[in-house]
Regions:
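Ordered, amphipathic secondary-structure segments that act as subunit-interaction surfaces
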Residues: 80-104
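Short, structural beta-strand-to-alpha-helix junction motif
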Residues: 8-13, 22, 39-42, 77
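Metal- and O2-centered redox machinery and metal/ROS homeostasis
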Residues: 1-10, 20-24, 28
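Hydrophobic, well-structured mid-protein blocks that either form specific transmembrane helices
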Residues: 95-131
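Hydrophobic/aromatic-rich structural module bridging two neighboring secondary-structure elements via a short loop
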Residues: 60-89
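Single conserved hydrophobic/aromatic residue that forms the stacking wall/gate
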Residues: 150-159
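N-terminal alpha-helical targeting/anchoring segments
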Residues: 17, 24, 31-46, 52
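Short, contiguous alpha-helical
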Residues: 124-148
């Protein structure tokens, strides 16, 4: 059963996973491994050098039926969030897309000269290439730029 209210630092990490096992992917992207026993979210994050507020902002965003995180934005660690997003890209590019391609090959008949099957595979490969290009651009440019903005002094501070 999925929790309907927000998780807090004092919630047990095991309860979080029992409530919603899909949050295991979020944990993985923050480099949090299993084996936390009865520890709270805050304890697990602290022991692994993960910003707890950022972790919870992402977790609570994932479980809500909303596409807004306005309440949590002021509390997140930008470097932690950028690392999470890079890990999400890595998972999608290096696991999801190859898995989809493999299943696509299994589903279509590639054993004969089937032009439609070839075109489907060609279209998917072009799509995957565009997705990779987009995510690589974000990883190399957008996330780097955001981190630079985050660490640079604001114009107000330079007076």
């Amino acid at each position: 059963m999925y929790k309907t209210s927000k998780y807090t630092p004092t919630d047990k990490m095991s309860y979080l996973i029992c409530d919603n096992y899909t949050l295991l992917q979020v944990m993985s992207r923050f480099d949090l491994s299993l084996g936390f026993g009865d520890k709270t979210v805050q304890e697990v994050c602290r022991e692994n050098g993960v910003d707890c507020r950022t972790f919870l902002a992402v977790v609570n965003f994932m479980i809500e039926d909303s596409d807004r995180m306005e309440d949590d934005v002021k509390d997140i660690s930008m470097p932690s969030l950028m690392n999470y997003l890079k890990q999400a890209h890595h998972y999608f590019l290096d696991f999801c897309l190859p898995t989809i391609r493999r299943k696509l090959i299994e589903a279509i008949d590639c054993s004969t000269e089937n032009e439609v099957a070839f075109l489907i595979l060609k279209f998917f490969d072009q799509y995957a290439g565009e997705v990779r290009k987009h995510m690589d651009y974000e990883d190399m440019n957008v996330f780097t730029y955001v981190c630079l903005l985050y660490t640079s002094p604001s114009p107000r501070d330079m007076r």
